[in-house]
C-alpha cells in the first residue's frame, strides 16, 4: 500500500497518482478532483457518504476517503483563484459526482501524464487545465475582488508579506482587508499563508528532492512537526505515508 506512481506541481495546482491508506477527516484549501482507475471508493463529506468512481470537492470543506486495497487513486488539487480554477467554484454544493464520461476522459489524461517522463511544471499546468475543461466547459467564471486577486499573487510571489503591508497596498484598513480576504476566499489570511507554506514545502520535496525537515524550513515552517500537522490536516494522511 502507499505506492506512489507520480506527483506533479504547478502554480495552478498539483496532481497525485498512487495507492494510499484510508484518510482521516480533513479539510483542504484547494478544489479537489478525486477519481479511481480500477475500483470505486467511499467518500464522506460534511453530511453525506457515497460510493463513487470520481467526484469534485469544493475548497475548505471536510472530506474523508476510504479505498479497497490496491485501488489506484488520483487527486487533482486546483488553486481556486488561479487560471481556470474559479470556473469550478460552486457555493451551493460541497461536492458533486463526475459523470462516467468525465471520469473516463480525466483518467485517460492522467494516465498519459503518468506514462511520460516529463514532470515539468508547464506540463502539469497543461494537464490540470485540460482536466478543468472536462468539467467546466460552460461554467461562467466566478470573479474575485481585484484587490484580493492582486494580494494572492503577492502572497505567492513574496518570501514574506504581512497583513498590514497588503492592507496598505490596497489603501484600506487592516480590519477591512482581513474581512474582505475571508469573504472572497472563505479562509483567513493566516490560514491562506499556511496553505502557501505547505505547497512550497511539497514542491521542495517533490521537485528538489529535499528531506521532509529541509523542505519544512524551505516552505517557511518553524519546524517539521508543524509541517507534519499541517499536512495531516490538509490531506488526512501523514506525509511519511504518502510522499517519498
Q: What are these model-derived regions, one by one?
A:
Residues 2-5, 20-23, 222-235, 239-243:
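Helix-turn-helix/homeodomain-like alpha-helical modules used for DNA recognition
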Residues 15-18, 131-139, 182-186:
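Short, Lys/Arg-enriched N-terminal segment that forms or immediately precedes the first helix
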Residues 163-164, 183-224, 228, 244:
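Terminal helix-turn-helix DNA-binding modules in bacterial transcription factors
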Residues 54-55, 66-67, 77, 148, ...:
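Localized chelating/binding microdomains
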